[in-house]
C-alpha cells in the first residue's frame, strides 16, 4: 500500500488545527513517514520549497513523531532544519523571516497528554482548509 493510500484510509485527517490524535495509534512510524512525504509532494506541486523546518513541543511522544517524520522528509531529499523543542510560533517566524518557506510543528497544545498533533505551514502561515483537502486527496 502506498503512503497516499494509507493516508486516504483515514476518515478525515485534519481538524481545526492540523492533524490530532492518539500518539500511539494514529502517529505510527509508517503514518508519520507517509504524511511527511505527502506534505513534500504538496509543496512541490506548488513550487514552494525543498527546505523545511520542524519543531516540537516537550510532550513525551514528540521526539518519536519527529524522528519518523524526518525519515519521510529525508527520503524526499529536502533540506531539514531541526528546530528542536520550540514554541508554536517559532515555525511561523522561521518561514516568514528566513529562506525556509515550509514547516511542521509537532504539538498537542492543550489536548490530553496521550494525544499529539502535527501542524503544517506554507505560504507564510498555517496551511488553509483548501490545502488540507488537497493533501488528503
Indicate residue ranges for each PLM-predicted region.
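Gly/Ser-rich phosphate-binding catalytic loop and adjacent alpha/beta segment
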Residues: 2-137
Amino acid at each position: 500500500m502506498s503512503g497516499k493510500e494509507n493516508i486516504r484510509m483515514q476518515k478525515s485527517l485534519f481538524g481545526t488545527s492540523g492533524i490530532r490524535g492518539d500518539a500511539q495509534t494514529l502517529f505510527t512510524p509508517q503514518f508519520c513517514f507517509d504524511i511527511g512525504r505527502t506534505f513534500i509532494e504538496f509543496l512541490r506541486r506548488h513550487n514552494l520549497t525543498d527546505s523545511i523546518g520542524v519543531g516540537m513541543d516537550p510532550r513525551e511522544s514528540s521526539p518519536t513523531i519527529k524522528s519518523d517524520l524526518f525519515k519521510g522528509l529525508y527520503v524526499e531529499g529536502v533540506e531539514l532544519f531541526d528546530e528542536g523543542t520550540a514554541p508554536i510560533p517559532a515555525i511561523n517566524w522561521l518561514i516568514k523571516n528566513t529562506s525556509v518557506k515550509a514547516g511542521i510543528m509537532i504539538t498537542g497544545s492543550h489536548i490530553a497528554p496521550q494525544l499529539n498533533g502535527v501542524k503544517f505551514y506554507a505560504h507564510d502561515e498555517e496551511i488553509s482548509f483548501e490545502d488540507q483537502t488537497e493533501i488528503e486527496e
